[in-house]
């Protein structure tokens, strides 16, 4: 998982999710695209 100041969708399967006040990107097709804002 990458930790970034700004998270972006990297492909069309990426989804932006907000959990416990933390913005995350989850991606089923490409697990490398997982990101967390921090």
UniProtKB/Swiss-Prot annotation:
Gene Ontology annotations of biological process type: translation
Disulphides: none
A GO MF term: structural constituent of ribosome
InterPro entries: Ribosomal_bL36 (IPR000473), Ribosomal_bL36_sp (IPR035977)
The UniProt record lists the keyword Zinc: no
Secretion signal, residue range per the UniProt entry: none
Pfam families: Ribosomal_L36
Superkingdom of the source species: Bacteria
Keyword presence, Transcription: no
GO CC annotations, alphabetized: cytoplasm; ribonucleoprotein complex; ribosome
Keywords: Ribonucleoprotein, Ribosomal protein
Family: Belongs to the bacterial ribosomal protein bL36 family.
Name of the protein this chain belongs to: Large ribosomal subunit protein bL36
Organism: Buchnera aphidicola subsp. Baizongia pistaciae (strain Bp)
Organismal lineage: Bacteria, Pseudomonadati, Pseudomonadota, Gammaproteobacteria, Enterobacterales
